[in-house]
Swiss-Prot record:
InterPro entries: Depp_CoAkinase, P-loop_NTPase. It comes from Dichelobacter nodosus. Keywords: ATP-binding, Coenzyme A biosynthesis, Cytoplasm, Kinase, Nucleotide-binding, Transferase. ATP binds at residues 10-15. The gene is coaE. It catalyses: 3'-dephospho-CoA + ATP = ADP + CoA + H(+). This is Dephospho-CoA kinase. Residues 2-197 form the DPCK domain.
């Protein structure tokens, strides 16, 4: 069973993902894969270097993620090129891990699950949701960005309404951690029951 887990920035995906990991689910983390692929000499690192030269790299060869992110927000052409490089490489690695490590319950932790069409390889999708105002407040505290930057990031993602309409299950993470975990437990049991049927 392959289950996608997604949600807007600062919605609490990691909190929920950690709960599922504690239950023994096999977690495939798209952000972690992306970081691995941009390590010096990695497949995406090589492609970024070939396309952008040294302009987005530190002197030691590491990718300057903050600079690249800023360029992507201000230039649609750069954003599209970076996505053309990243998304196929991340998808290929996710598919490789699914096939190499078959598991009764594999959770794909993918922030841009719908934008990258990875929901199509999932049997079910869980969306972690919070109101946009709370998303902005949490993101400002967590990421050290200002409110305008958070609004820009949110606007660059699929709309909350669209994300919710594509979900099989929704976790409301706007209350206590205990309440979020309770929802995780209920959804986990429902998915296991469906898988057993």
């Amino acid at each position: 069973m392959i289950v996608g887990l997604t949600g807007g920035i600062a919605s609490g995906k990691t909190l929920c993902c950690n709960w599922f990991a504690a239950q023994g689910c096999y977690i495939i983390d798209a952000d972690l894969i992306a970081k691995e692929l941009v390590t010096v000499g990695g497949v995406v690192w090589l492609q970024l270097r070939a396309h952008f030269g040294e302009t987005i790299f530190y002197a030691d060869g590491n990718l300057n993620r903050a600079l690249l992110r800023e360029k992507m927000f201000h230039n649609q052409e750069i954003k599209e090129k970076v996505n053309q490089i990243f998304h196929p490489a991340v998808r290929a690695e996710i598919e490789k891990r699914i096939h190499l490590y078959p598991h009764a319950f594999t959770l794909l932790d993918v922030p841009l699950l719908f934008e990258t069409q990875l929901h199509k390889i999932c049997h079910m999708v869980i969306v972690v949701d919070i109101p946009v105002s709370l998303q902005i407040a949490r993101g400002v505290c967590r990421d050290g960005v200002n409110s305008a930057q958070m609004q820009r990031i949110i606007a660059s993602q699929i709309s909350r309404e669209k994300r919710l309409s594509l979900a099989n299950f929704i976790i409301d993470n706007s209350n206590s951690i205990a309440q979020t975990y309770q929802q995780c437990q209920q959804i986990y049991q429902q998915i296991l029951s469906l898988n057993a049927a």
